Amino acid sequence: MVTRLSASDASFYQLENTATPMYVGLLLILRRPRAGLSYEALLETVEQRLPQIPRYRQKVQEVKLGLARPVWIDDRDFDITYHVRRSALPSPGSDEQLHELIARLAARPLDKSRPLWEMYLVEGLEKNRIALYTKSHQALINGVTALAIGHVIADRTRRPPAFPEDIWVPERDPGTTRLLLRAVGDWLVRPGAQLQAVGSAVAGLVTNSGQLVETGRKVLDIARTVARGTAPSSPLNATVSRNRRFTVARASLDDYRTVRARYDCDSTTWC
């Protein structure tokens, strides 16, 4: 089904560049099952569960001339083996070697001509462990209730639920002309929404002179701060390149729960 990206999802999609990829990475380190976990078994598991996240078989199609936000369309050339990949460390691989591998994988941008996600099965990790690393674009999983592929393949019980056989038939590509006509129709029916879609959201938010003055004041304050160069000294205050480093910080889940209860918020709000 052809659906238009929301304003926030379209923003994540458009803001991406090689130095600032807009995806979310998830690393799972697991004990290897007694029966093992082959690449073929992982492929089968992912294929079984894709119906729960149908967006993962869709790609983004931009509208010519930028008349409207991009749309999600079925990827008629969807290839599960492109998205689910296999890698290995020189056995027995250490955690440091795993972190170096993840840093290299994290530096690679997602291919915008395909569904915006990847999964890597990493073998050879010491202490009889394996790792799963997934990359999912923010446009795919934006929102608290959205599901990512890494969550869908993880079961809460030892015995996974039964999944009905999935026979997926991709829809026909809508084509450039149809998308343009649909965009023109949206302009006629909802001109305000389309203005917001092409970059006039700020004008829509400023509804009176008081808001305009306040917005201008904030912009000037930010400009003065930048001009004075008052950012604190930190290794993070540097030009961002496409290269990445991966490191680990350990924290107690009980501490997260305490903060969440104290301030009545979810963990993602303050992390």
Swiss-Prot record:
Enzyme Commission number(s) from the entry: 2.3.1.20
Listed pathway(s): Glycerolipid metabolism; triacylglycerol biosynthesis
Known catalytic reactions: an acyl-CoA + a 1,2-diacyl-sn-glycerol = a triacyl-sn-glycerol + CoA; di-(9Z)-octadecenoylglycerol + (9Z)-octadecenoyl-CoA = 1,2,3-tri-(9Z-octadecenoyl)-glycerol + CoA
A GO term from the CC aspect: plasma membrane
pH-activity relationship: Optimum pH is 6.5.
EC class: transferase
MF annotations from Gene Ontology: diacylglycerol O-acyltransferase activity; O-acyltransferase activity
Pfam families from the UniProt entry: WS_DGAT_cat
Protein family membership: Belongs to the long-chain O-acyltransferase family.
Annotated PANTHER family: O-ACYLTRANSFERASE (WSD1-LIKE) FAMILY PROTEIN, WAX ESTER SYNTHASE_DIACYLGLYCEROL ACYLTRANSFERASE 4-RELATED
Protein name: Probable diacyglycerol O-acyltransferase tgs3
Native source species: Mycobacterium tuberculosis (strain ATCC 25618 / H37Rv)
Gene (name only): tgs3
